[in-house]
């Protein structure tokens, strides 16, 4: 048979063993065909079981049968060249190469995952501010008052402010946009902008700064379950209230949720006025009948109508997200009800999903609230395969090291190429796990740098961890590419960035504002 496997770089060891058993990859059987399509530089789903070492084994087994797509059709020539420079300098340096897979044998380098500069088709339109083209990459540098390193939280807070301020500045400037050769000009809009983050905490930091400046945004995560939302917990209380409308405690709990949005004054009035409370209970009794006769989805739609929720929610910040989550949960509940018997079974199902959201499927991932003109805050994982006109990467200097605390196990390579899970691991094995973390961070950095079409704004600064006063930037993906493993001080980091910018056309390094409004 003929098989075509896309995104092969995200294959797990078990999946590869299955493919290899069927097709015997190394045999190159002329009576069958197995086409493996993937970019190992974008293997970033280790948390889902993907293993780049499986890709590398397949690459070794198919030596001489490799085909490379060497032209970028997404980005401008200037941006592609600048990204090439980031990785080429590390690839050319003596050591392990840009992606930490290069080894040396008798003075000869062997690298199963080399960085190979790509060509660019380029774009006709230019991203401009006034008459000037915006540089392909802008590095915004921030250090403490004395030029020294900052703790992660402090650096994150300031760079989130700088990121939001730059976005506001561009959006408020009518001369910032995309110019075509024929004179056509499209002004920059919020939907043209994506901010890439690694964690929910980073997303919250930058969205808070955008909100303070009146810029609406949406957060898109590859793994955030709708069952972790406040709407899910509130909906659980509401289902209990509708299922037992004669239980005054359940009814009061349902009415007191953020989902219903009743003020403290109204809730106090309902607690003191039996007649008013009975009127609300009657609404729930009616909804209970709808649930029994037409199903949970019909009941929840009636809830929206009878309680006047959409208008109430949409008048507040975040209301569109609340409505989207509510409708998403209603759909999931309706699907689950087809396999469950009775209202209490459905309530128990929802409670279980809330307690264990990690067990969910892609259907449970939070949905985009609308196609409105919003700035997108996206995890790097979620951004893979996508493209955006302008990208912000405000926290590019940060990283999360693998430490003994919080690491219940590590995976250790074996002679046969497999990796063994160890619960009781040595310091050397822990160091290997952190090295693997850095390898994946480098690939995540590559994914982030290759998302924009026109321009990339990066926040950067000297970073310290814990009580140490020393810079640890070399342990991040972006820092390793600039310095290798050598630890250097804050002043030297700035000098290297300046030298890199001077040697790289269309890359500028600027001081981030020390104070941001």
Residue ranges and their predicted role:
Residues 406-413, 443-452:
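Conserved SF2 helicase motif VI
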Residues 497:
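Extended acidic/charged loop-beta regions that coordinate divalent cations
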Residues 311-318, 427-441:
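Short, solvent-exposed helix-loop connector elements
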Residues 5-256, 264-268, 289, 295-304, ...:
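Conserved motor-region signature of P-loop NTPase helicases/translocases
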Residues 401-435:
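Conserved catalytic motifs of ABC-family nucleotide-binding domains
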Residues 2:
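Key residue(s) within conserved catalytic/signature motifs
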Residues 273-290:
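Accessory alpha-helical DNA-binding modules that contact the DNA backbone or grooves
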Residues 372-375, 440-444:
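Short, conserved clusters of charged catalytic residues that mark active-site
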């Amino acid at each position: 048979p003929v098989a075509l496997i896309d995104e092969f770089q995200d294959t797990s060891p078990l999946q590869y063993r299955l493919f290899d058993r069927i097709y015997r990859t190394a045999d190159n059987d002329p009576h069958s065909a197995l086409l493996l399509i993937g970019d190992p530089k974008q293997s970033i789903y280790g948390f889902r079981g993907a293993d780049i070492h499986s890709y590398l084994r397949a690459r070794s087994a198919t030596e001489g049968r490799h085909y490379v797509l060497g032209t970028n059709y997404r980005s401008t020539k200037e941006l592609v060249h600048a990204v090439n420079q980031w990785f080429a300098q590390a690839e050319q340096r003596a050591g392990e190469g840009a992606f930490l897979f290069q080894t040396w044998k008798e003075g000869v380098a062997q690298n199963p995952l080399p960085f190979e500069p790509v060509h660019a088709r380029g774009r006709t339109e230019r991203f401009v501010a006034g008459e000037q083209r915006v540089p392909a990459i802008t590095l915004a540098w921030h250090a403490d008052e004395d030029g020294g390193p900052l703790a992660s939280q402090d650096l994150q807070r300031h760079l989130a402010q700088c990121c939001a301020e730059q976005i506001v500045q561009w959006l408020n400037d009518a001369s910032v946009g995309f110019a075509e050769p024929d004179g056509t000009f499209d002004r920059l809009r919020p939907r043209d902008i994506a901010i890439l983050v690694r964690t929910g905490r980073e997303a919250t930091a930058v969205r808070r700064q955008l909100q303070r400046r009146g810029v609406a945004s949406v957060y898109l995560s590859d793994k955030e379950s709708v069952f972790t939302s406040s709407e899910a917990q509130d909906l659980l209380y509401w289902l209990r209230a509708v299922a037992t409308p004669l239980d005054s405690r359940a009814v009061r709990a349902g009415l007191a949720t953020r989902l219903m949005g009743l003020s403290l004054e109204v809730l106090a009035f309902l607690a003191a006025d039996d007649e008013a409370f009975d009127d609300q209970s009657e609404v729930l009794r009616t909804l209970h009948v709808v649930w029994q006769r037409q199903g949970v989805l019909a009941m929840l739609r009636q809830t929206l109508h009878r309680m006047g929720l959409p208008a109430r929610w949409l008048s507040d910040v975040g209301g569109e997200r609340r409505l989207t989550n509510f409708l998403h949960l209603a759909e999931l509940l309706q699907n689950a009800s087809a396999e469950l018997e009775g209202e209490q079974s459905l309530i128990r199902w929802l409670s279980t999903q809330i307690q264990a959201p990690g067990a969910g499927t892609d259907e449970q991932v939070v949905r985009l609230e609308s196609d409105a003109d919003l700035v997108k805050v996206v995890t790097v994982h979620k951004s893979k395969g996508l493209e955006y006109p302008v990208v912000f990467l405000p926290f590019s200097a940060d990283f999360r090291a693998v430490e003994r605390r919080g690491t219940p196990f590590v995976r250790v390579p074996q002679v046969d190429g497999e990796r063994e899970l160890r619960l009781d691991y040595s310091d050397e094995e822990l160091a290997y796990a952190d090295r693997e973390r850095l390898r994946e961070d480098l690939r995540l950095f590559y994914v982030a740098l290759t998302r924009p079409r026109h321009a990339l704004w990066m926040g950067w600064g000297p970073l310290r961890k814990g009580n140490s006063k020393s810079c640890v930037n070399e342990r991040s993906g972006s820092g390793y590419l600039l310095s290798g493993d050598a630890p250097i001080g804050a002043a030297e980091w700035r000098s290297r960035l300046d030298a890199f910018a001077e040697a790289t056309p269309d890359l500028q390094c600027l001081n981030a504002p020390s104070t941001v409004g």
